[in-house]
A protein has these predicted regions:
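A compositional/biophysical signature of low hydrophobicity enriched in polar/charged and small residues
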Residues: 1-243
Length: 243
C-alpha cells in the first residue's frame, strides 16, 4: 500500500533513517514501521541494505558499458559476466545486443586485462560480437546526483575491505537493518583483520566525510514493487549545450 511505498522511499533516501522519523510522516508508531519493514524484507521487496559510493574516489576512474550479442542458448556467457568483479550491473536488453553490462575501470592496464578476458570468452560464443560505450561523465547514479568528479583518494586495504562489506551487506544480514560497526568489526576479524568497533566507526565516518560513501540505502526488488520494465535511453545532445 502507500505506507509501504513511502517506507521504501524513505529507506532508499537514507537506509539508516530512524523508525520514529519515518513513522512521523505516516502517522505510524515506530513499532508499526518496524513490523512493515520486516514484512517487506521477508517478502523480498527489500533485498537488504547497501551503500552508494563515488567510484572515482576509490580509484575507478572510468565507467564502461559493454553490449554483448548472444545466442539464447548461451546462458553460460551471462554467468561468466556475473562472476567478473568489475561488472557491477548486468541486464538483458532488447535489440541487436542482448546483454548490457556496466564495468568499473581503474586505468588503461586494467581496461586491457578486462578486454582480453572478454575477447577470450567471446571467441567461444555464437556471434562473437560486442561493443563498448565509454561514459565520460556520471551525473546521477542510484538516485544520487554526482557533483563534479573528485580526485581519487589513496585508500588502505582496511578501508577497501569495509567498503566491500558495506556494498555486499545482503550476503551477511538476516534482517533489513544495516550492519552495525560492531558487526563490521567481527566480519573483518573473520577475514584476519583485528580492529576495534571504535576504529571501524572512525574509518566509516571518514569515508563519509571524504565523499567516498555518498548514501546508505537499500536494494529493492523493483519488479515486486511494480516496475516491470527497465529502460536504458540514449539521448543525442549538442556537446556545446552542457559542460
Amino acid at each position: 500500500d502507500n505506507c509501504d511505498l513511502s517506507i521504501l522511499e524513505a529507506l532508499q533516501r537514507d537506509g539508516r533513517a530512524s523508525l520514529t522519523d519515518i513513522g512521523k510522516g505516516l502517522g505510524l508508531s515506530r513499532f508499526a514501521v518496524k513490523d512493515r519493514i520486516e514484512i517487506l524484507f521477508r517478502d523480498r521487496l527489500i533485498l537488504g541494505p547497501t551503500v552508494v559510493i563515488d567510484p572515482s574516489r576509490v580509484g575507478f576512474r572510468r565507467t564502461m558499458f559493454f553490449e554483448f550479442k548472444t545466442n539464447p542458448h548461451e546462458p553460460w556467457l551471462a554467468e561468466f559476466l556475473k562472476k567478473m568483479k568489475e561488472c557491477d550491473t548486468l541486464n538483458g536488453i532488447t535489440g541487436e545486443y542482448s546483454l548490457l553490462g556496466r564495468f568499473r575501470i581503474a586505468d588503461e592496464e586494467h581496461f586491457g586485462r578486462i578486454l582480453r578476458r572478454i575477447d577470450e570468452v567471446m571467441t567461444k560464443s555464437f556471434f562473437k560480437k560486442y561493443r563498448v560505450v565509454n561514459a565520460i561523465n556520471t551525473f546521477k547514479e542510484s538516485g544520487v546526483p554526482f557533483e563534479r568528479k573528485a580526485a581519487p583518494l589513496t585508500l588502505g586495504d582496511i578501508d577497501l575491505m569495509i567498503l566491500r562489506i558495506l556494498l555486499n551487506q545482503t550476503r551477511y544480514v538476516k534482517t533489513p537493518q544495516p550492519l552495525s560497526t560492531t558487526q563490521i568489526s567481527r566480519l573483518l576479524g573473520d577475514l584476519g583483520v583485528k580492529i576495534s568497533q571504535p576504529s571501524v566507526f572512525k574509518r566509516l565516518k571518514r569515508l563519509e566525510d571524504q565523499g567516498v560513501i555518498l548514501r546508505h540505502t537499500i536494494l529493492v526488488n523493483q519488479e515486486k514493487v511494480g516496475f516491470k520494465t527497465k529502460l536504458v535511453v540514449r539521448i543525442k545532445v549538442n556537446p556545446a549545450s552542457y559542460d
